[in-house]
Amino acid sequence: MKFLEKLTSKKGQIAMELGILVMAAVAVAAIAAYFYATNVSNTGKQITNSTNQTTQALADAISDATSQMSNITD
């Protein structure tokens, strides 16, 4: 019970400490949200680049196949 008496005797200090703790938690959450948002943005760009490269590779393969077919019929 002496522990509780010590806590209640310094109410102002506890309020300040809790405020600092909440402020630190908010700062950590803001930093985590920033990195999450940047990673989501980068992932979208990487997916777009990968899709474009795949589409280009397939278009090249189709072009090669059609040119070989035209060589067969000549």
UniProtKB/Swiss-Prot annotation:
Its main location: secreted. Residues 1-12 form a propeptide. The N-terminus is cleaved by the prepilin peptidase EppA, which recognizes the class III signal sequence. A motif (QXSXEXXXL) lies at residues 13-21. The keyword Glycoprotein applies. InterPro entries: Class3_signal_pept_motif. It is found in: Secreted; Cell surface; Fimbrium. Disruption phenotype: Deletion mutant no longer produces pili at the cell surface. Major component of the type IV-like pili. Contains an amino terminal motif QXSXEXXXL, which is part of a class III signal sequence. This is Major structural pilin EpdE. It comes from Methanococcus maripaludis (strain DSM 14266 / JCM 13030 / NBRC 101832 / S2 / LL). The lineage of its organism: Archaea, Methanobacteriati, Methanobacteriota, Methanomada group, Methanococci.
